[in-house]
Amino acid sequence: MIDADGYRPNVGIILMNERGQLLWARRVGQNAWQFPQGGIKSDETPEEALFRELKEEVGLDPHQVEIIGKTRGWLRYRLPKRMLRHNSKPLCIGQKQKWFLLSIRCPDASVCVDGTETPEFDGWRWVSYWYPLGQVVAFKKDVYRRALKELIPSAHRRLEK
């Protein structure tokens, strides 16, 4: 599903542990790391897409996490020209994302990034809150910065409990 402006609706998932560290996942066969994310189907709400993607990409069920924050609006990034699929219609020029900050409520061993036939990730680790800004691919960096900045008050509230 691509909107009239060429953006694919998507959810971004930031999983935080009790120490304030974030789950950082390595894309299959690459040395590229990112937060889990995925498209919103036409018959889904962003929350439904969040939980579907959470299960597919990280192996967690809704009862194993708690939503502690989400971005107010859509955050957009454009794909680099080399990544555009000009033969697909309508043309997708980027993604618009709703970001969710989740508190993980289960042991680390519950995380399973390779539990599907075609996993997105082949590894993961916990990193400090701002670490991803120095590591994510350039075209996603501004969206990551905006999401982390908007969600940090929710992270602080959780850590103060």
Swiss-Prot record:
GO biological process terms, alphabetically, are: mRNA catabolic process
Residues in Nudix hydrolase domain copies:
6-149
Q: Has UniProt tagged this entry with the keyword Hydrolase?
A: yes
Report the domain of life of the source organism: Bacteria
| Cofactor(s) it depends on | a divalent metal cation
For this chain, one GO molecular function annotation is: mRNA 5'-diphosphatase activity
SUPFAM superfamilies in the cross-refs: Nudix
Summarize the protein's role.
Accelerates the degradation of transcripts by removing pyrophosphate from the 5'-end of triphosphorylated RNA, leading to a more labile monophosphorylated state that can stimulate subsequent ribonuclease cleavage.
Could you tell me the keywords of this UniProt record? Hydrolase
Pfam family of the protein (one): NUDIX
List the GO terms this entry assigns under cellular component, sorted alphabetically: cytoplasm
For this chain, the family text in UniProt reads: Belongs to the Nudix hydrolase family. RppH subfamily.
Cite the EC number: 3.6.1.-
Primary gene name: rppH
Organism of origin: Marinomonas sp. (strain MWYL1)
Q: What is this protein called?
A: RNA pyrophosphohydrolase
Concerning CDD domains, the annotation shows: NUDIX_Ap4A_hydrolase_plant_like (cd03671)
Renumbered to this chain, motif Nudix box spans: 38-59
Q: Which NCBIfam families match?
A: PRK00714.1-1, PRK00714.1-4, PRK00714.1-5
